[in-house]
């Protein structure tokens, strides 16, 4: 969470820092109780079988990335969870994935997904929502 505060102090664009300092609001559909609610699954395939298609031209996007099962030690049920996934356009999904693979000024030379490793689920979830807002 301290790292998120550092981002809000100017490392990211005004839109994202505003979202971080102003809280999560706007037109995004997500469940802020993702850390304690939702239906969890052992695999992504099981989750997709439950939720179905993301819709034409869309893909499923994990708010806290699947890589964080290994990197942060989160359980599959936390990541493969109905409260940790949303349908976004393929174009937006590719842009977000590229961002998570990039080095940003606030990541101390690490790619974003590695910088996130070890932060709490709730901090990563809030960060993920703010990244989605930045690209939508």
What are these language model-derived features?
Residues 1-37:
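Hydrophobic, membrane-inserting alpha-helical segments
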Residues 2-3, 11, 43, 116-120:
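Alpha-helix capping and helix-coil boundary motifs
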Residues 7, 11, 15, 57-58, ...:
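Solvent-exposed, well-ordered amphipathic alpha-helical segments
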Residues 19, 70-76, 127-128, 133:
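Generic alpha-helix signal with a bias toward terminal, lower-confidence helices
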Residues 31-102:
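Betabetaalpha-Me/HNH-type nuclease active-site subdomain
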Residues 86-136:
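Catalytic cores of phosphodiester-bond-cleaving enzymes
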């Amino acid at each position: 969470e301290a790292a998120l505060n550092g981002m809000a102090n100017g490392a990211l664009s005004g839109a994202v820092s505003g979202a971080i300092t102003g809280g999560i609001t706007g037109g995004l559909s997500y469940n802020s109780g993702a850390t304690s609610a939702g239906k969890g699954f052992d695999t992504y395939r099981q989750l997709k079988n439950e939720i179905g298609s993301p819709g034409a031209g869309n893909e499923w996007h994990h708010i806290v990335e699947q890589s964080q099962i290994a990197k942060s030690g989160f359980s599959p049920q936390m990541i493969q969870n109905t409260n940790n996934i949303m349908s976004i356009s393929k174009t937006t999904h590719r842009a977000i994935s590229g961002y998570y693979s990039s080095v940003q000024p606030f990541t101390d030379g690490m790619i974003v997904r590695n910088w996130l490793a070890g932060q709490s689920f709730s901090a990563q979830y809030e960060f993920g929502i703010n990244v989605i807002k930045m690209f939508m």
